[in-house]
A protein has these predicted regions:
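Short, acidic, Ser/Thr-enriched surface-loop or helix-capping motifs
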Residues: 3
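C-terminal, surface-exposed recognition/capping segments
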Residues: 7-17, 33-130
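A short, polar/charged loop-to-alpha-helix boundary motif
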Residues: 18-28
Length: 130
């Protein structure tokens, strides 16, 4: 479950969509190209949006793999994606639209350069023992 309250988007550094294919990386260092990321086994053609229907569970977690649900069926959360860009995952939602939030809401529709008042910072702390 990510961002249960849905009050702002947060970036997930280790989850990208590159050319429609979802890639994941569980540990740093992260990048914005997908280099050294692993294929999750989920690909979306073109671009689109819709209520989530199916999900795939793997060691990367549970990730949406199909749309066709509604606001009252399946996960009841939405998915936006853009297969034409390298998109950094946004999770949570935003407080200015009640339908743009939820425990499973996923946005793969924006590049890392996207900035808005409703997008939080990507906090990351790496501890190195000396």
């Amino acid at each position: 479950i990510e961002k249960w309250w849905g009050n702002r988007w947060d970036r997930i550094n280790g989850l990208l969509m590159v050319g429609g294919e979802i890639l994941a990386k569980m540990t740093p260092p992260y990048n914005l190209t997908g280099k050294d990321f692993e294929k999750v086994g989920i690909t979306f053609a073109s671009s689109g949006n819709g209520y989530q229907k199916g999900t795939k569970s793997s060691r990367f977690g549970r990730i949406v793999n199909s749309i066709g649900g509604s606001s009252s069926t399946y996960t009841c959360d939405y998915l936006w994606w853009n297969a034409g860009i390298t998109a950094v995952a946004l999770v949570g939602g935003n407080c200015n639209n009640g339908e743009n939030c939820g425990a499973d809401y996923l946005n793969l529709n924006n590049s890392a350069g996207n900035a808005n008042w409703n997008i939080g910072a990507s906090n990351f702390f790496s501890y190195r023992s000396v």
